[in-house]
Amino acid sequence: TEVSQSRDLIRVGSLKGPTSMGLVHMMNDESLSETYDFTMAAAADELLASMVSGELDIALLPANAASVLYNKTEGKIQVIDINTLGVLYLVSGDPSITSWADLAGKTVYLTGKGTTPDYVLQYPLREQAAANGFDAGDVKLEYKSEATEIASLLSENPDAVGLLPQPFATVAMSQNEALRLVFDMTSEWDKVQGEGGSRLVTGVTVVSDSLIETNPEAVAEFLDAHEESAALALSAPDETAAL
């Protein structure tokens, strides 16, 4: 029956933005429509709640949210891959910003206090402030609920400063030619970490222990399909953008 088929579907949740970019070819593959049920959320909290309640089997999450989920489920999830490295950028049309010290006295708009973008900005900001003699507290951080809000704000006011993931950074710059990439946060992270330091892991894929225990073959098949979909996204960016 239709109901029993829906119960057999592997329920996959992801966030709008870079964590979903590697999934888009899977989402649009009709041959997989009877295997996966995809949902996209605007905020990580929605995915956490769905994983805790058992409404999702697999979720693509910010790395820090995955650690929160691990604790909430008392260790009943596993990380099965890293789906996003970096992809965060500081964007502005303010020509006076050429260094971290130039952010003093300005407001930076970003999403989610205590989420991955927050950590990715604050860590190098503190390190650069200590190294270059300015106070990190002089940089005001203002949090918005979604990256689309920041992209819209920047396109209307290019002198503002925002932290955006792809593809939102590119979308904002296409809407206002004054905007530019001020910092690639992956490069800034690497500068602070130094040679041999940790890489900027921003997104991971987690799966419930119950799915691993009851259907390990399905997990392996998902990993293969996800890898193929992500490779297509990288090799055919124009086609991926159209999806």
How would you label these PLM feature ranges?
Residues 2-143, 160-161, 166, 177, ...:
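Short, glycine-/small- and polar/acidic-enriched structural segments
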Residues 46-47, 148-150:
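Short acidic active-site motifs
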Residues 64-65, 149-242:
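Pocket-lining segment of extracytoplasmic ligand-binding domains
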Residues 99-102, 146, 235-238:
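Alpha-helix capping and helix-coil boundary motifs
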